[in-house]
Amino acid sequence: MKILLAIALMLSTVMWVSTQQPQRVHTYCGRHLARTLADLCWEAGVDKRSGAQFASYGSAWLMPYSEGRGKRGIVDECCLRPCSVDVLLSYC
């Protein structure tokens, strides 16, 4: 009985993995990068916030996190190398 359950679980896992499509990656540079990012952020309903909004809370510990993704930028991740839509959305 345990063997049948294990086989059924394994088959369902294999079928689930086979139905998952990997995200396509593209290279976005220049105006194409800017337009794609603007469209994605607009569709997601995300507005870029300034650091001044975090300062209004009076929490100094939030300021280091308001700087974004660090020294590597969107050009490093999406122009020099292909990136997915999820990576682009992380810059909204």
Swiss-Prot record:
Propiece span(s): 50-70
Claim: Thylakoid is one of the keywords in the record: no
Subcellular location: Secreted
Modification Pyrrolidone carboxylic acid occurs at: Q20
Record key words, sorted: Cleavage on pair of basic residues, Disulfide bond, Hormone, Pyrrolidone carboxylic acid, Secreted, Signal
Statement: the UniProt record of this protein carries the keyword Protease: no
Pfam families to which the protein is assigned, alphabetical: Insulin (PF00049)
Signal peptide per UniProt: 1-19
InterPro entries: Bombyxin, Bombyxin_A, Insulin-like, Insulin-like_sf, Insulin_CS, Insulin_family
GO molecular function, one term: growth factor activity
UniProt cross-references to SUPFAM superfamilies, sorted A to Z: Insulin-like
Family: Belongs to the insulin family.
Function noted in UniProt: Brain peptide responsible for activation of prothoracic glands to produce ecdysone in insects.
Extra remark beyond the main annotation: Silk worm has two kinds of PTTH: 4K-PTTH and 22K-PTTH; there are many forms of 4K-PTTH.
Subunit structure: Heterodimer of a B chain and an A chain linked by two disulfide bonds.
Protein name: Bombyxin A-1
Organism of provenance: Bombyx mori
